[in-house]
């Protein structure tokens, strides 16, 4: 199939367009004013909105004016602030979108150009799209403006690398739009720089004014504080100097006064000594006359008063001793009543023992003997050779060690027996004895030197035994002993019950050790309290 002349021309034109010579011969084509106008308006609007958004971030007043009076400005500001925290993602999305749009535009332009080439007979001259990058000085510009210029330069480089062949009219329109965008961005950059410099100058002047104000205020305050401190130090120095001089003057006056008083005292002393000597002679003569007269029996009265004071001391000691004995008797009766009270399961008599100790110590002070054999203390004797210059008599007798009294011995035994321990009542001792019935049954079945098997066997067979009660016999088997002890405890015959239990040997005695200890403590306390009562009654 033969190709037509038009198709040959199209093929030839494509071959020439693939060669990067910059121009190609084509038939004349109609200009696209609407498309060029659209590109110019779009790029201008983009530059206007981009500049308004960037300057709104620097100046709040301009931002309010821009968002309130320019259409779609508020939405664009919100979108910018939304993507401001993630600029990398925003740039990637913008670049992908611009690349896709440019590819679509290029494909559309290519398709439409091919269609128009096939349908048109008139061929016009085409040029390869080659745009100049935006050479704008961004050294001191806003970072966001730098990003926008960089993105636009990347887009221009991408369009240049694609080697698009477009008609000359469109090429001129795009180039003009590129120049307009470059001019607008340059103006925007200069505007931003000027606004930033004005803002920095204004802010610097404000900061300098504020610092000057602070400096003047701090200077005035420092001068005021310095003046105040200096005045205060001067006042303190003046006050201290005044006090020091007053103190020195007062000391000098006091020293002169003391010197004058000492001189006057010496003169008066010399005069008074002679007068006192004469006065003493007169008084001595009068005293001798009175002593030989009305005061002749003064020594006899003094001896009788001493005898009366001794009698009062002896009476006081006797009364105190009787009161101590009464209190001791009361405490002993209190201990007896508590020990014999069956309503109390156990008794602690530590408080009563402390009172007994106090009363016994008080009573022992009344029973002390004199240091001399004749019953009189050396200090009571007159005319003794050991009498000193001051009338005191030093005793030369050897100290006597009195043997401990029965009262103190009984108290010590009571304290060692009952200190920190509880005394059981007769009923409690009887109940504890009844609790030993099962152990007694087991012990009655144990063979001599029984082992674990013997213990278990005796424990099992003891369950089939009965406890022996009633009138006890004189037999020595365990049941009879248990019955006799229970009968003695029932009639409160604790002494015989303890003797029966103590006579046991072997395992039964081992079982009853705790019970024997409690019962013996009860018996010992009863006997010691009885001895204490008898001793108190003999005093």
Swiss-Prot record:
InterPro entries given in the database record: MIC60 (IPR019133)
Membrane topology recorded in Swiss-Prot or TrEMBL: Single-pass membrane protein
Keyword Transmembrane: yes
Positions in the Mitochondrial matrix compartment: 17-36
Family designation: Belongs to the MICOS complex subunit Mic60 family.
Coiled-coil ranges per UniProt: 172-267
Transit peptide endpoints, chain numbering: 1-16
Subunit architecture: Component of the mitochondrial contact site and cristae organizing system (MICOS) complex.
Protein species of origin: Saccharomyces cerevisiae (strain AWRI1631)
Keyword line: Coiled coil, Membrane, Mitochondrion, Mitochondrion inner membrane, Transit peptide, Transmembrane, Transmembrane helix
Ranges facing Mitochondrial intermembrane side: 57-539
Main function: Component of the MICOS complex, a large protein complex of the mitochondrial inner membrane that plays crucial roles in the maintenance of crista junctions, inner membrane architecture, and formation of contact sites to the outer membrane. Plays a role in keeping cristae membranes connected to the inner boundary membrane. Also promotes protein import via the mitochondrial intermembrane space assembly (MIA) pathway.
One GO cellular component term: MICOS complex
Transmembrane segment boundaries: 37-56
Protein name listed in UniProt: MICOS complex subunit MIC60
Listed GO biological process terms: cristae formation
One Pfam family recorded for the sequence: Mitofilin
Keyword Mitochondrion found: yes
Subcellular location: Mitochondrion inner membrane
């Amino acid at each position: 199939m033969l190709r037509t002349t038009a198709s040959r021309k199209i093929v030839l034109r494509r071959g020439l367009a693939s060669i990067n010579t910059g121009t190609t011969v084509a038939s004349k084509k109609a200009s696209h004013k609407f498309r060029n106008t659209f590109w110019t308006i779009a790029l201008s609007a983009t530059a206007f909105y981009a500049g308004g958004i960037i300057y709104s971030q620097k100046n709040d007043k301009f931002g309010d004016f821009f968002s309130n009076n320019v259409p779609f400005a508020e939405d664009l500001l919100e979108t910018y602030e939304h993507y401001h925290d993630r600029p990398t993602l925003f740039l990637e999305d913008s670049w992908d979108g611009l690349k896709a749009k440019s590819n679509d535009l290029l494909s559309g332009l290519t398709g439409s150009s091919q269609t128009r080439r096939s349908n048109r007979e008139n061929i016009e001259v085409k040029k390869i799209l080659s745009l100049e990058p935006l050479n704008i000085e961004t050294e001191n510009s806003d970072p966001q403006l730098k990003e926008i210029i960089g993105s636009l330069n990347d887009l221009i480089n991408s369009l240049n690398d694609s080697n698009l062949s477009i008609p000359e009219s469109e090429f001129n329109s795009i180039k003009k739009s590129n120049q307009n965008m470059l001019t607008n961005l340059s103006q925007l950059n200069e505007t931003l720089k000027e606004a930033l410099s004005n803002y920095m100058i204004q802010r610097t002047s404000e900061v300098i004014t504020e610092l000057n104000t602070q400096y003047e205020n701090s200077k005035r305050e420092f001068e005021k504080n310095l003046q105040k401190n200096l005045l205060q130090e001067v006042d303190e120095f003046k006050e201290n100097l005044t006090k020091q001089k007053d103190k020195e003057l007062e000391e000098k006056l006091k020293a002169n006064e003391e010197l004058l008083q000492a001189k006057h005292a010496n003169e008066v002393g010399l005069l008074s000594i002679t007068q006192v000597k004469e006065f003493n002679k007169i008084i001595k003569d009068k005293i001798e006359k009175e002593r030989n007269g009305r005061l002749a029996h003064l020594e006899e009265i003094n001896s009788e008063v001493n005898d009366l004071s001794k009698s009062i001391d002896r009476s006081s000691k006797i009364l105190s001793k009787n009161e101590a004995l009464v209190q001791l008797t009361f405490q002993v009766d209190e201990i007896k009543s508590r020990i014999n009270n069956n309503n109390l399961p156990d008794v602690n008599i530590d408080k009563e023992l402390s009172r007994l100790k106090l009363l016994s110590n008080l009573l022992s002070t009344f029973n002390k003997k004199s240091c001399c054999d004749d019953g009189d203390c050396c200090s009571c004797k007159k005319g003794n050779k050991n009498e000193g210059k001051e009338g005191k008599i030093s005793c030369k007798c050897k100290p006597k060690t009195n043997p401990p009294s029965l009262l103190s011995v009984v108290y010590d035994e009571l304290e060692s027996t009952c200190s920190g321990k509880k005394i059981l009542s007769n009923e409690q001792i009887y109940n504890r004895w009844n609790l030993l019935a099962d152990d007694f049954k087991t012990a009655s079945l144990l063979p001599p030197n029984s082992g674990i098997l013997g213990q278990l066997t005796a424990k099992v067979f003891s369950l089939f035994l009965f406890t022996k009660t009633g009138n006890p016999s004189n037999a020595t088997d365990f049941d009879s002993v248990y019955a006799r002890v229970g009968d003695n405890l029932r009639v409160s015959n604790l002494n015989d019950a303890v003797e029966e239990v103590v006579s046991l040997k072997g395992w039964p005695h081992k079982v009853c050790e705790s019970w024997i200890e409690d019962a013996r403590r009860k018996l010992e306390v009863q006997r010691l309290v009885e001895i204490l009562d008898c001793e108190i009654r003999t005093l």
